[in-house]
Amino acid sequence: MDMLFDPGWAAHLLLLAAEEAAAAEAESGGLFDFGGTLVLQIVNFLLLMTILSAVFYGPISRVIEERSEYIRSNAGSAQRRFDEAKALADQYEQELRTTRLEAQQVIAAAEAEAQKIRAQQLAEAQREAQERIAQAQADLDKQKQAALASLSGEVEAISRTLSEKLLSDSARRF
């Protein structure tokens, strides 16, 4: 059995066949000798092909086929995993877009609410300022009226005093 796997054996067999062919050609003197040597060479060749087929080509073909099947299986599995990963990536991107859109909507709503509150506070501040201005104006008007009333009374008193003085000076002169 070890003899079948010995690479030197096959080379030795070929060398023997070549020697026999050379000897046969030398004896016959022609290019082709259709005698027993040619038949023996054909038998040797067919025997060698059968042995190589049984020992090397069959197992090698089987290993190559198994490897091809393994590669096809892994390629299919890899394609499925790639498709799953792509689907997950697409789903992630869709969720990310949705989340960003929701975040933009929340930000827009918060900005609108802040603008509304700002407008309300500004309106309230303006109303309070108008009330204070109106109150201050009313207080100034009251103080003005009080000052005018006080001055009016004083002017009347001064006018009377001045009139009396002028009348008394006029009366003394006449």
UniProtKB/Swiss-Prot annotation:
CDD domains, A to Z: ATP-synt_Fo_b (cd06503)
Predominant cellular place of this UniProt entry's protein: membrane
Keywords on record: ATP synthesis, Cell inner membrane, Cell membrane, CF(0), Hydrogen ion transport, Ion transport, Membrane, Transmembrane, Transmembrane helix, Transport
Transmembrane segments: 38-58
GO cellular component, one term: plasma membrane
Family: Belongs to the ATPase B chain family.
Name the UniProt record assigns to this protein: ATP synthase subunit b'
Higher taxonomy: Bacteria, Bacillati, Cyanobacteriota, Cyanophyceae, Gloeobacterales
